[in-house]
From Swiss-Prot:
Modified residues (N-acetylproline): 3
Residues found modified as N6-carboxylysine: 201
Description of how the protein assembles with itself and partners: Heterohexadecamer of 8 large chains and 8 small chains; disulfide-linked. The disulfide link is formed within the large subunit homodimers.
Species this protein is from: Corylus cornuta (Beaked hazel)
UniProt modification remark: The disulfide bond which can form in the large chain dimeric partners within the hexadecamer appears to be associated with oxidative stress and protein turnover.
Further comment: The basic functional RuBisCO is composed of a large chain homodimer in a 'head-to-tail' conformation. In form I RuBisCO this homodimer is arranged in a barrel-like tetramer with the small subunits forming a tetrameric 'cap' on each end of the 'barrel'.
Similarity remark: Belongs to the RuBisCO large chain family. Type I subfamily.
N6,N6,N6-trimethyllysine modified-residue sites: 14
List of catalytic residues: 175 (proton acceptor), 294 (proton acceptor)
Necessary cofactors: Mg(2+)
Lineage, uppermost ranks: Eukaryota, Viridiplantae, Streptophyta, Embryophyta, Tracheophyta
Name of the protein in its database record: Ribulose bisphosphate carboxylase large chain
Amino acid sequence: MSPQTETKASVGFKAGVKDYKLTYYTPDYETKDTDILAAFRVTPQPGVPPEEAGAAVAAESSTGTWTTVWTDGLTSLDRYKGRCYHIEPVAGEESQFIAYVAYPLDLFEEGSVTNMFTSIVGNVFGFKALRALRLEDLRIPPAYSKTFQGPPHGIQVERDKLNKYGRPLLGCTIKPKLGLSAKNYGRAVYECLRGGLDFTKDDENVNSQPFMRWRDRFLFCAEAIYKAQAETGEIKGHYLNATAGTCEEMIKRAVFARELGVPIVMHDYLTGGFTANTSLAHYCRDNGLLLHIHRAMHAVIDRQKNHGMHFRVLAKALRMSGGDHIHAGTVVGKLEGEREITLGFVDLLRDDYIEKDRSRGIYFTQDWVSLPGVLPVASGGIHVWHMPALTEIFGDDSVLQFGGGTLGHPWGNAPGAVANRVALEACVQARNEGRDLAREGNEIIRAAAKWSPELAAACEVWKEIKFEFPAMDTL
């Protein structure tokens, strides 16, 4: 060891354990425009001060470990460490705090959601000094977001590809989700598309099982798409699920979809992983494919109020990793989604610039600069009576996806699709005429049903169906 190295390693080094807050709690720190900012909901163990808990989160998700190490002297901790710069109590909750942490940009690999999450939501979530920990929000600085391609195409390019403007897009998940043969599956797709839907969808569970191998499904669905397009004169699509056990197999399926000339493929981005998702998004941009994203497994991560990660963070991560659509709850259907919170992350998906708004759970102002937007998909337990509310809540730049609400029609798939298309067109026309969809929605649907027997039959079947449970996702 050289004398110079000897001196650097020994000066200022004192072995042992010291409180995290001595190094990582810095309430006087002024955040930089290039910092990644995080808001954590922290529940410390009894006897652990909130400042120590917040500092521990900053340390364990950046440069710190449980004891002082001599190699700290070989780098500049001030340059690289995370800093807990503010702590506030959570209103109405005992022993819960919001800890704000700033991370210098040099901690993260460019263009890698995988690397960002490995640090920020890594081992720190198993830290013993905390009873629970939840990441509520992230501020992604433009200096970092510009290192990502983002969505393969974005909202405007998708509308131009489909030649569809001025209304939400309509979709349907084919049911039963498992067990159909490829030929019967393709027939169900055709019936829905010819009835007036823009898209049909593979269920997230459908990959390449013994009852229906992926290549057979792709071929029969492509046949259904082209047949429905010829009959209706509209561009149609089916979300062909390319999710697979390996990245290589996933790309092989996307290549086959491109060779068939279909417009869109699909990926389960959480079970598939961010590395696979980003690879697929790059392929889709290079080859003109739209990319639909399903969020299977999200509730394992985001449903508990005091531990895990809020979906708004997963939504931001998806916009960076890449996807043209993502499921975002419905507010009115069978799946979780409180209105103001849902609209908060819908704006984070679609808009270029979103102001901080704690009433909607948005902890930081987010500037996406030129990153394309993502269409939110409302799906899960919705039917024609929900159409006015969905049109009013989500607006034009959305996909409204009715699975059982199409296939459960008493007359079959095509009449179910007709009912949904008629209901949507009636709601859009009423809105454009200045009518109040929230107050007059049922009246608008009843009026349209008078000249659409398909809609009238759907209204009768689902007039009593409600999913009324208290939302778990509250502020």
